[in-house]
């Protein structure tokens, strides 16, 4: 799922409903961005599992994610780094891989940071099922 168009969402919802009607599990391949997890949840699409290399690819191309925010292309656009740092502070994101400006120079740190952002997004979506107020707060970020 590289692009979540309305048609993609309708198709995924229909596939999920059909799979569940037969007692099957529902896996989605290729979640490209952690924000997609929230969008899927908002559409009533809750896969049993998913996979992604988006965190790896984005980091390799100089982009970093925050759990529920846009991606930032920090290696080529100085303003994007500033926006990322502001969004990071606003969202209280803190991981050992993005503590300083080395993130702009180290592909491995970006990749690992993006993996943490995906894991945090999954946790927010999972907590949202148990704590709707937390989920709604996360959606408003």
Residue ranges and their predicted role:
Residues 1, 28-33:
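Glycine-rich beta-strand-to-loop/alpha-helix junction loops that act as flexible
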């Amino acid at each position: 799922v590289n692009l979540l168009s309305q048609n993609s969402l309708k198709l995924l919802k229909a596939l999920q409903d059909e799979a569940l009607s037969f007692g099957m599990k529902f896996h989605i391949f290729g979640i490209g961005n952690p924000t997609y997890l929230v969008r899927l949840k908002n559409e009533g699409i809750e896969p049993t599992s998913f996979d992604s290399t988006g965190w790896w690819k984005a980091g390799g191309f100089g982009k970093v994610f925050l759990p529920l925010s846009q991606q930032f292309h920090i290696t080529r656009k100085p303003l994007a780094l500033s926006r990322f740092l502001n969004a990071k502070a606003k969202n209280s994101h803190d991981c050992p891989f993005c503590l300083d400006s080395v993130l702009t120079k180290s592909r491995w740190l970006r990749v690992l940071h993006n993996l943490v952002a995906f894991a945090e997004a999954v946790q927010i979506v999972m907590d949202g099922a148990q704590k709707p107020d937390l989920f709604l707060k996360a959606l408003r970020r």
